[in-house]
Amino acid sequence: MASSNLLTLALFLVLLTHANSSNDASFNVETFNKTNLILQGDATVSSEGHLLLTNVKGNEEDSMGRAFYSAPIQINDRTIDNLASFSTNFTFRINAKNNENSAYGLAFALVPVGSRPKLKGRYLGLFNTANYDRDAHTVAVVFDTVSNRIEIDVNSIRPIATESCNFGHNNGEKAEVRITYYSPKNDLRVSLLYPSSEEKCHVSATVPLEKEVEDWVSVGFSATSGSKKETTETHNVLSWSFSSNFINFEGKKSERSNILLNKIL
């Protein structure tokens, strides 16, 4: 009888362990609406369902806008020492008034939940200093129209990896972006394609997200426009999908369950 009770208790605890699994996430946005977004600064949604990050309709300079998915995303589960992998696909269009002298660019970013806009200009609304700031807890993939390159920024506007990409040459054209993060190797990869010109750009870096961002993050976009009328540009996101999963969870969960059973039985 005692053995039977112990077995029942063990099975209950295993089921409880399974119930407390990490939170995978997935969404697909073909047309944006304000109900599933946190909009900050000048960001808004057009009648066509496009995400408009910067406002330069009246040649306003120094515009900044941020938009994040309304639900927080779990990146790290410290209870089982498990880090999520993720992938995101989106399309965007940057339209500069003067494609040879425009600023500043657009970024896809992981930021703290409840984060507020930071400095404008080259800081892209994501950072308050050029130096490494661990408290920023922000990782961003930046499409830098000043330097015509893709950057990977980790808690600083000083990139840890860059690759040239001619945004000026593709002014006003739709770009297709895919970003993947493979957690077992901390491998962050970015690929961009301009279908109209067939130009491709790639960049990658090793980023230990468990050390650089908080366990729960907001995912989304931030952009800033030039501080002079001749350098203004618009940043529109046309579609967006995101998926995250704890790919090692099943193995770790089984191992944890077996340890629990062995200790009890």
Curated annotation (Swiss-Prot):
Keywords attached to this entry: Disulfide bond, Glycoprotein, Lectin, Plant defense, Seed storage protein, Signal, Storage protein, Toxin
PROSITE patterns: LECTIN_LEGUME_ALPHA, LECTIN_LEGUME_BETA
InterPro entries: ConA-like_dom_sf, L-lectin, Lectin_LegA_CS, Lectin_legB_Mn/Ca_BS, Legume_lectin_dom, Leguminous_Lectin
Domain of life: Eukaryota
GO molecular function: carbohydrate binding; nutrient reservoir activity; toxin activity
Protein family membership: Belongs to the leguminous lectin family.
Protein name listed in UniProt: Arcelin-2
